[in-house]
Amino acid sequence: MEEFRMYRDHTKVIQIGNKKIGGGNPILIQSMTNTKTENVQATVEQILALEAAGCDIIRCAVPTMEAAKALKEIKKQIHIPLVADIHFDYRLAIAAMENGADKIRINPGNIGSTERIKAVVDVAKERNIPIRVGVNSGSLEKELVEKYHGVTAEGLVESALDKVHIIEELGYDNLVISIKSSDVMMCARAHELIAEQTSYPLHVGITEAGTLYSGNIKSAIGLGIILHQGIGDTIRVSLTGAPLEEVKSARRILKTLGLRKGGVEVVSCPTCGRTQIDLIGLANKVETMVQDIPLDIKVAVMGCVVNGPGEAKEADIGIAGGVGVGLLIKGGEIVKKVPEDQLLDTLREELMNWDSNKTQK
């Protein structure tokens, strides 16, 4: 893949459990459970499924002391770093760290007095647990809204840095910053601004992005703009839907930007009057079929035997459909003709026997 990205290569390295972020380490995918954290079994089952899908870091809501204590048992049964999401009650942050949280997410502005923030920081310092300082456009301080005549990227950055300075003044800098907005361009601008002013790792995402359809579009555009500039160390695709879909989308975004390998990429033509088969159905079946195949290749699914071979040239392997008969294509060359009803099975067999060392690019 031709390289056009800029790199923010001075990012501070932060250890989160068994993972490192920043300093040129790979961008990690994060999601958040939607189970009741107090329900250990349900939460563990969901996390294990997310792990299998490619989730690198998982965050759990900790609204109660029971949830904080549940982290200890959850932690024993999972294999990725566990982040505790804390609001308002500093005691929950302390309990979460005491029960195995690898990182905590707080907003110092709603934790309370300096003494309470210090109590949290002291435990984090003692255990060397990173703190993610999060700000959100929906809760920007009134004085900053007034100062900037509304919710702006500049206001979000000032809010984030103010909160970071509170913790720095307490002698701690094991920090990650997140700035979230549902406004894509505001979010992108805020990340550009803060990347110029600090070397802390940044967790990136478009908050309240929406449903699977609209949320994926907003997240892909927003994350694409930000990541293309070399900004971002962890990402989350926030969707109103199953966390598993967040991870799938995040993997696809990183792969599309050339930031992560692995996983089959399916390309297919948009259909036209020359389409001779049920291409939509076939393409969907192929995409479902390849979800769990760990090959780093491109598969083309084309709708006619006239233009299909040419359009599939950039793919490693492809199929093109025709009336009653289709084509199997490798490296842009027609390998053989295949009965139409055997196209999917033929492709599956080829992928199962694929030799990655002979991948044609």
Q: What do the predicted segments below correspond to?
A:
Residues 27-33, 58-60, 82-86, 104-106, ...:
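Hydrophobic faces of well-ordered beta-strands that scaffold small-molecule active sites
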Residues 77-80, 97-104, 125-128, 195-201, ...:
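Glycine-enriched alpha-helix->loop->beta-strand junction motifs that scaffold or abut catalytic
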Residues 91-132:
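Hydrophobic or amphipathic alpha-helical targeting/insertion segments
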